[in-house]
Amino acid sequence: MASNIMQRCNVFMSERVKLHAAMLALQFGYAGFHIVSRAALNMGVSKVVFPVYRNILALMLIGPCAYFLEKKERPALTLSFLIQFFLLALCGITGQSRILSLRIVLHIPTFASAIQNSVPAITFIMAAALRLEKVHISRRDGLAKIIGTVACVSGATIITLYKGPPITHIWRPNLEVTASYFKAFQGNDLSAKSENWTLGCIYLLGNCLAWSGWIVLQAPVLKRYPARLSVTSFTCFFGVIQFLIIAAFFETDLEHWKIHSGGELFTILYAGFVASGIAFSVQIWCIDRGGPVFVAVYQPVQTIAVAIMASIILGEQFYLGGIFGAILIIIGLYLVLWGKSEEKRLGLLQAKSSMVPENQPDNMDQSATLIINSSNGIKPNTSSSLTQPLLLDTSYKTVNIPSPSDEPQP
């Protein structure tokens, strides 16, 4: 039994390392999406056409993999599953699509990333309300998850609202290739009216609600439909359908559907294959293995990644407030992850201590047999359950179980 517990712990440790590495890579992938999506919109790519191309490319990447790799895992497709996939697409693809609002508010890519750092708190509340996340307020692990979530959101808020003195650029780009790809960032439409800024903030907060709902809803769907790639494929498919319906009303000019430059092609390919196809697949795997709160709590790391990438690629200034916020985010992330790890550890210990025999009468007979055999000089069976008392009640000594093998010899 001890070897089984150790084996479970080793598997848990190796999987936990994979989950952390996957989530870190995922946040840097999304950070790159903030950069290239800003470039795409400033190059003139339609804010309706862009997500259509993005999700078509993602479907082209994930669809064949799901079809061939999950033939045996994929349950029968029913109307109930189709409705759930449609709702996932409505929240995760259409509802949370930041592209529709980037034209208004994405003057500094760090802002769009930072305002989304309310996602951990919203996801935590949703998951707790739906009982997908256990919160033991009276225990250390529960308090650590609550305090860590607040710290992550607070750190992201500091990065957004407090700049502080500037710090030297991490690296100032001087390559002509970089300038040619991202010269559209220095467009003339970077000054926004206050009403547009406010509208954009409200829209982004609505997207955060949709993003949190998407993360939380995937967990119960995966329990009934365990084929992860297939769920992602159906989500992208319905997302394409929904955006095509939107485009039929708001983007009727065929000229906007054309790709005019290599820069536009690069941004669309990155958004489709990296920020959608690969990212969605990694994210749903992490949700399945780590839970929705585990995935959401990594969201503030995206703010740090965007700030670093914006400083490297765009030459944006890095401020002291960003350092303070990043430290607070890291502390909060550690607290949440420690809380979840402690919760699993306590769960394993509780499961180990609560192991009971399946058939209680058989165990009663087994205990009596142990005593009778011991009285005859035979070594008792040492494979009894851990839940049996070490000192048996003396009343069992008077129990006489008739058995041919135990009859006294004349």
From Swiss-Prot:
Species of the source: Pinus taeda (Loblolly pine)
Q: Does the keyword Ribonucleoprotein apply?
A: no
Superkingdom of origin: Eukaryota
Protein name according to UniProt:
Auxin-induced protein 5NG4
Which keywords fit this entry according to its UniProt record? Glycoprotein, Membrane, Transmembrane, Transmembrane helix
Q: Which sequence ranges are marked TM in the entry?
A: 17-37, 48-68, 75-95, 110-130, 142-162, 197-217, 230-250, 265-285, 293-313, 318-338
GO CC terms of this entry? cell cortex; cytoplasm; plasma membrane
List where in the cell it is found. Answer: Membrane
Biological process, per Gene Ontology: auxin-activated signaling pathway
Would you list which residues are glycosylated? Answer: N196
Record topological domains on the Cytoplasmic side:
1-16, 69-74, 131-141, 218-229, 286-292, 339-410
